[in-house]
């Protein structure tokens, strides 16, 4: 989880003065929102319904999520906000780009 936290905080996806993706969250001092989303583990290769057999068991996943949150909070003083693990949530955001990356551990 330390490696994932390092990547989340250090991945250069924010524009510098030249408009190039060259600044990290740590560089910008922005906040981090961590929300558990098991649907990202869906296997959509066949059929018309996603399979979640590759997702970690809920208890294991929650421990991992909490560990990642703890590490990010230690390493990112500007702040880390979270959703509630396993809860249905309505999340509002502005995606400037749109730019979305899937970081793998």
Feature locations, PLM:
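Residue-level signal for inorganic ion chemistry
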Residues: 4, 35, 99
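Active-site-adjacent structural patch at catalytic or cofactor/ligand-binding sites
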Residues: 33-39
């Amino acid at each position: 989880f330390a490696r994932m936290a390092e990547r989340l905080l250090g991945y250069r996806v924010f524009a510098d003065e030249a408009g190039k993706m060259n600044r990290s969250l740590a560089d910008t001092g922005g906040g981090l929102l961590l929300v558990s989303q098991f649907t990202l583990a869906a296997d959509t290769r066949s059929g018309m319904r996603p399979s979640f057999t590759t997702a970690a068991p809920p208890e294991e996943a929650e421990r991992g999520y909490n560990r990642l949150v703890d590490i990010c909070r230690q390493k990112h003083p500007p702040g880390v906000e979270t959703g509630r693990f396993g809860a249905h949530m309505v999340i509002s955001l502005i995606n400037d780009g749109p730019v979305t990356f899937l970081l793998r551990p």
